[in-house]
Amino acid sequence: MRLRTALNEYKRARGTRFPEECPTQRGAFSGHGDRLVYVDPGGFIRDYSSSLSGLYGIDRSRFGIETQDRTIWFDDLNPVRQHYYRETNVVETEYDAGKFTVHQYDLTLGRAHLTHVELRGAIPADAHLTAFLTFAPGGRETRVGRLIHEDAGPDGSKAVEVFHRKEHDYVTASTGLTDVRGQIPERFEEILSDEYFEFPREAVLQRYEDTHLSGDVVVSAPLERTGRAARTTLVTQLSNHEEVSREEALADLRH
């Protein structure tokens, strides 16, 4: 875990019995090969893969359903249950959003991780998935690179690449990415403050490093509708470019 994330999590948990810890006993793990991903009952995912593969992947994340009026974050909803789906390593987390339910399925396959989100019920017409992700290639806090590949995702859609030296991490969605936004990480004075900062946040991006040299990214994906259900799958993939090329990694991501 990066220093920024660890300090912010400590501030959030201050006042609890063990604020310095990041407990995982409440959630579940999905792993395959040399990638291991923790799935929290609040929906966020985090990589615990560095000791297995030397690749750090996702340091923090947050998922939500965005409409024209608001964003419904999964960690603000009441989780109905979390369990391993039919005795597999698929983790299903279910939430009650009032007029509809949210079903999140997480599965790790090799160095790819799939987060499948399905809504059931009276779904808002303009609803789409929003995901905040912080990648930490090489365990880096800052000075990572970020590229947007306009036609590298499924059906010629976008894919995002975050990298530092040999580790290159990718994200796309089965229904394509319609929006990719940068995020300003915690500034030095914010790291020193006592205040907990919630991400993602609305802020004016003024400097080049805010949009290109940070592992923080917000992506949006449309939902594919079938009857009273709507769904999409977010795909993240870790790669070592001493083992595979960018072209090979993007080809794996598409398929």
PLM-predicted stretches and their roles:
Residues 1-255:
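Terminal accessory carbohydrate-recognition/targeting modules of carbohydrate-active enzymes
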